[in-house]
Amino acid sequence: MGHQNIWYSHPRKYGKGSRSCKICGNKHGLIRKYSMNICRQCFREYAKDIGFIKYR
């Protein structure tokens, strides 16, 4: 059994490892509110298209 076979063999059904950004697939900095599941970088890029308005 090589290193690659062992490295990601554990099932990811819950926790941080199971979730990723819908747009880019990134696992860090996820915004999960309202079940968006978008990373913060993609959120800044697509916020206006989604319907969020920046007041300041």
Swiss-Prot record:
Zn(2+) binds at residues 21, 24, 39, 42. SUPFAM superfamilies: Glucocorticoid receptor-like (DNA-binding domain) (SSF57716). One of its GO terms (cellular component) is cytosolic small ribosomal subunit. InterPro entries: Ribosomal_uS14, RIbosomal_uS14_euk_arc, Ribosomal_uS14_sf. GO terms for molecular function: structural constituent of ribosome; zinc ion binding. Keywords: Metal-binding, Ribonucleoprotein, Ribosomal protein, Zinc. It comes from the Eukaryota. Coiled coil: none annotated. The keyword Cytoplasm does not apply. The keyword ATP-binding does not apply. It holds the Pfam family Ribosomal_S14. Binds 1 zinc ion per subunit. Its cofactor is Zn(2+). Belongs to the universal ribosomal protein uS14 family. This is Small ribosomal subunit protein uS14. It comes from Griffithsia japonica.
